[in-house]
Amino acid sequence: MASYEAVIGLEVHAQLRTRSKLFCSCSTAFGADPNAHVCEVCAGMPGVLPVLNEKAVEFAARMGIAVGCTVNRTSVFARKNYFYPDLPKGYQISQYEQPICEHGHLDISVGDAVKRIGITRIHLEDDAGKNIHSAGENVSYVDLNRTGVPLIEIVSEPDLRSAEEAVAYLKALRAIVVHLGICDGNMEEGSFRCDANVSLRPRGAAEFGTRAELKNLNSFRHVQRAIEYEISRQADLLDDGDKVVQETRLYDSVKNITVSMRGKEEAHDYRYFPDPDLIPIHIDEARLAEWQATLPELPQARLERFMSSFGLSAQDAEVLTAERDHAEFFEAAVKLYDQPRKIANMMLGPLQRELNQRGTSLAVSAMRPEALAELVRIIDAGLISAKIGNDVFGELFENGAMPEAFVRERGLVQISDTSAIEQAVDEVIAENPAEVEAYRGGKTKLVSFFVGQVMRKTRGKANPALVNELLASKLG
């Protein structure tokens, strides 16, 4: 592999968060019964005419502005012709020669280096349906709920040189669409997905090698592993004197391999031509200026501000700014209690643990910034220990209770009365003479044993600092 350079480009599809589809009024809501959100337009019935969703145009333009694209004042829809069971019209409505956005870029960080990745174009298109293959039955079903859902396809230049760079680019792109509010970024549900074009060339060569397109990449991990495997596969072929075939390959996440799916089509295979049922999109200067003026703070700018204003590490800032609701939650909590690093630690630790375990999102949880800020405050004030705070976090997350009232009702307030703790320390020392002798003989690591025994006697409520202080003085 040392003699080859990988050349990678990504085609990213982001489903737009519009209430209705791109060319009809059917709902875009995920999870409905099969074929519940289907009308004559998205089913491709003869004689029906599409009506463009204006909000989808706005969302596409906002994305273009966010990544430094030229937003074309005029763009045209084209028919992309191919046959597949989940494409009832026999063609996809996309854009070809005149897309809505062109010539942008996105800066990514890999290690200590910053690299600029070119964005060739962003275009609007409608999504296809979904084929469902029933196990054990010699039959496939077609669900057209997704047919006609608005997408933007974001096509990168072939500027990526490793799987790591590809994942960094994809994460940065996802953070932008989420912050803009134009896509929920859910890779598992397919609302944010990508295809990767991978080829190899001898190091120092200018010409590109033959590329393979990788599909079925529905997580960052799959993107990383599929590209790494494909690079290795192509390198082995070239080393053996074989040729790489231009084809579309499917990633098998169980076997961690890519398998041939079909020959890779060229643009002429789709016989693009302007859609006669749709007039060109015209965007005037006033509307474009309005969209530019109302663009929210973008993830990279927010990340840099979190580092400079709140003293967060690059890694912590990156995680907190990956999701818009997390970033806003963090800032709201810091406004209530000005301890940004402690707030960040609570969010990246216990809060993220609960979200992961319950498979939910912050937006629909009962936890509020006021509660998290108060929890950090009462730990700092010594009202409860950090351990108690961690132990009760799950209940606070579930019921949305305010921490101070909750711990007082449960009798969990930390014991900071020196005499009460001293009594527990004396009892532990008296009950464990062998351990005391061993400790005084040099086995100082036994202090954790004594601390644990004291905490057990006080049901975890003793102030840990006082426990350690008293043990140190009494054990000598």
UniProtKB/Swiss-Prot annotation:
Its EC number is 6.3.5.-. It is an enzyme of class 6 (ligase). It catalyses: L-glutamyl-tRNA(Gln) + L-glutamine + ATP + H2O = L-glutaminyl-tRNA(Gln) + L-glutamate + ADP + phosphate + H(+); L-aspartyl-tRNA(Asn) + L-glutamine + ATP + H2O = L-asparaginyl-tRNA(Asn) + L-glutamate + ADP + phosphate + 2 H(+). GO terms for molecular function: asparaginyl-tRNA synthase (glutamine-hydrolyzing) activity; ATP binding; glutaminyl-tRNA synthase (glutamine-hydrolyzing) activity. Keywords: ATP-binding, Ligase, Nucleotide-binding, Protein biosynthesis. SUPFAM superfamilies: GatB/YqeY motif, Glutamine synthetase/guanido kinase. Pfam families: GatB_N, GatB_Yqey. GO terms for biological process: glutaminyl-tRNAGln biosynthesis via transamidation; translation. SMART domains: GatB_Yqey. PROSITE patterns: GATB. Allows the formation of correctly charged Asn-tRNA(Asn) or Gln-tRNA(Gln) through the transamidation of misacylated Asp-tRNA(Asn) or Glu-tRNA(Gln) in organisms which lack either or both of asparaginyl-tRNA or glutaminyl-tRNA synthetases. The reaction takes place in the presence of glutamine and ATP through an activated phospho-Asp-tRNA(Asn) or phospho-Glu-tRNA(Gln). Heterotrimer of A, B and C subunits. HAMAP family: GatB. Belongs to the GatB/GatE family. GatB subfamily. This is Aspartyl/glutamyl-tRNA(Asn/Gln) amidotransferase subunit B. It comes from Nitratidesulfovibrio vulgaris (strain ATCC 29579 / DSM 644 / CCUG 34227 / NCIMB 8303 / VKM B-1760 / Hildenborough) (Desulfovibrio vulgaris). The lineage of its organism: Bacteria, Pseudomonadati, Thermodesulfobacteriota, Desulfovibrionia, Desulfovibrionales. The gene is gatB.
